[in-house]
Amino acid sequence: MVDFISKDRYDFQDLVRLVQVLRAPGGCPWDGAQTHLSIRRNFLEEAYEACEGFDRDDPEIMCEELGDVLLQVLFHADIERDAGRFTLDDVCDTVCKKLIFRHPRLFGSAESGGWEEMKQLEKGQKTASDTLDSVARSLPALWRAEKLQKKAAGAGLAPESIAASLDKLDLAAARLRKAAQEGGNPDNALGETLFAAVRVAAALQEDPETSLHQACERFIARFAAMEAAAEKPLRACSPDELRTLWNTQNPNEPHLRPLHEKRYNDHEQD
């Protein structure tokens, strides 16, 4: 076995081998028992924690969390190596070929089409519907709605003006209000309202994920200010007292540093 104890510094190949040792018979029972689905949530959590490092521009967090993401990639690849379906080298080969294919001018190919046309050709997508259907269903719903609308616009569905998108949001909200008041199932109307809000974001060229994250941060700050202003625990306050405390806090204070850079970019990586 490789001596992992005495090294002062480790490299990529050490990590690859360490994952193999942990998952091998006689290694760590927990690591050896994991499947793609059992650690799926771990993959997502590590990716979001890496994003937290980006948002804070903290190199220590980024270094640690990118390592955790890399560990997840190697772990899943090693599961497939054991299953005999593909290896880490296959993963590297696939992504290299993808990058070379998507940059024909740089790597000596003939004139290429646009970015979306290149991706459609690469993925074997023949229709605009194929392109929309290729958007991952596992994405957060707000993000998925944004991507669907952008791809539909790229296929020829003309983007709406700000006024038109706001009108559709008003219409969707009115349907939601009616469904709620009449005691029906508001699920569809609520979904349409959220989808319409994403259309407004597109018309404004704003990233809905960023906007909602910033709204969450403002909510936390306002709640903290309300709690600090209370003279007793919030649980001991009456509904009227809580309402007064909430309404006296300025929702725009303190001025929060945005969690995310503006991310409205038609040149996507997937």
What annotation goes with each model-predicted range?
Residues 1-65, 71-270:
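Flexible "arm" and connector segments at domain edges
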